[in-house]
């Protein structure tokens, strides 16, 4: 199974290298281990995360693409769909099948036709448009709903930290 996963990851890396999506850089942490990737995601334009550069790690299971990877930001983040420890909570990273909570449709969840590029583009969209109904960070979700100005202020501080300012 790991051989299939490795071939798929190598093909996806080649595609990302030849045709990188705007504002995203991603690839294996080293050539010895294609199952751990690092990514840099630029904050989406015209959002409170604009100009930020946010590092993350993608950890792929040995049965990829049958199962989704896990993704975690390695910098400070304050966002409704990012746990305080950096783990990303987004439908595309949830295991295939029906949602036991009945919130997501199976079409929104992981399937083997998804790709690293689709994951990263989905995360960029998530940064731009948080889903406050599915709060991984309760404080950020509440602030996004009730005090948008304060949320933007914290996001701007995180952007500055991401740039070493």
Swiss-Prot record:
GO biological process annotation, one example: negative regulation of retrograde protein transport, ER to cytosol
N-acetylalanine found at: 2
GO MF annotations, alphabetized: ATP binding; identical protein binding; ubiquitin conjugating enzyme activity; ubiquitin-protein transferase activity
PROSITE patterns: UBC_1 (PS00183), UBC_2 (PS50127)
EC number: 2.3.2.23
Active site: 89 (glycyl thioester intermediate)
Family: Belongs to the ubiquitin-conjugating enzyme family.
Biological or metabolic pathway of the protein: Protein modification; protein ubiquitination
Localization: Endoplasmic reticulum; Lipid droplet
UniProt function note: Accepts ubiquitin from the E1 complex and catalyzes its covalent attachment to other proteins. In vitro catalyzes 'Lys-48'-linked polyubiquitination. Involved in endoplasmic reticulum-associated degradation (ERAD). Required for sterol-induced ubiquitination of 3-hydroxy-3-methylglutaryl coenzyme A reductase and its subsequent proteasomal degradation.
Subunit structure: Interacts with AUP1 (via C-terminus); the interaction recruits UBE2G2 to lipid droplets. Interacts with ubiquitin ligases AMFR/gp78 and RNF139/TRC8; recruitment to lipid droplets by AUP1 facilitates interaction of UBE2G2 with AMFR and RNF139, leading to sterol-induced ubiquitination of 3-hydroxy-3-methylglutaryl coenzyme A reductase and its subsequent proteasomal degradation.
Keyword annotations: Acetylation, ATP-binding, Endoplasmic reticulum, Lipid droplet, Nucleotide-binding, Transferase, Ubl conjugation pathway
GO terms for cellular component: cytosol; endoplasmic reticulum; lipid droplet
Protein name from the UniProt record: Ubiquitin-conjugating enzyme E2 G2
Domain of life, source organism: Eukaryota
InterPro entries: Ub_conjugating_enzyme, UBQ-conjugat_E2_core, UBQ-conjugating_AS, UBQ-conjugating_enzyme/RWD
Catalytic activity as recorded in UniProt: S-ubiquitinyl-[E1 ubiquitin-activating enzyme]-L-cysteine + [E2 ubiquitin-conjugating enzyme]-L-cysteine = [E1 ubiquitin-activating enzyme]-L-cysteine + S-ubiquitinyl-[E2 ubiquitin-conjugating enzyme]-L-cysteine
Species in which this protein is naturally found: Homo sapiens
Every UBC core domain range: 4-164
CDD domains: UBCc_UBE2G2 (cd23796)
């Amino acid at each position: 199974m790991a051989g299939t996963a490795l071939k798929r990851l190598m093909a996806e890396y080649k595609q990302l290298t030849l045709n990188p999506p705007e504002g995203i850089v991603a690839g294996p942490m080293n050539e010895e281990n294609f199952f751990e990737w690092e990514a840099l995601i630029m904050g989406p334009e015209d959002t409170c995360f604009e100009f930020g550069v946010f590092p993350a790690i993608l950890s792929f299971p040995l049965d990829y693409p049958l199962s989704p990877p896990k993704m975690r930001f390695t910098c400070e983040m304050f966002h409704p769909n990012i746990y305080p420890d950096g783990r990303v909570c987004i439908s595309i990273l949830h295991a295939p099948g029906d949602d036991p909570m009945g919130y997501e449709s199976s079409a929104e969840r992981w399937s083997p036709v998804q790709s690293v590029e689709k994951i990263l583009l989905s995360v960029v969209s998530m940064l731009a448009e948080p889903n406050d109904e599915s709060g991984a960070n309760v404080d950020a979700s509440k602030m996004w709903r009730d005090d948008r100005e304060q949320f933007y202020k914290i996001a701007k501080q995180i952007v500055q930290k991401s740039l070493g300012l």
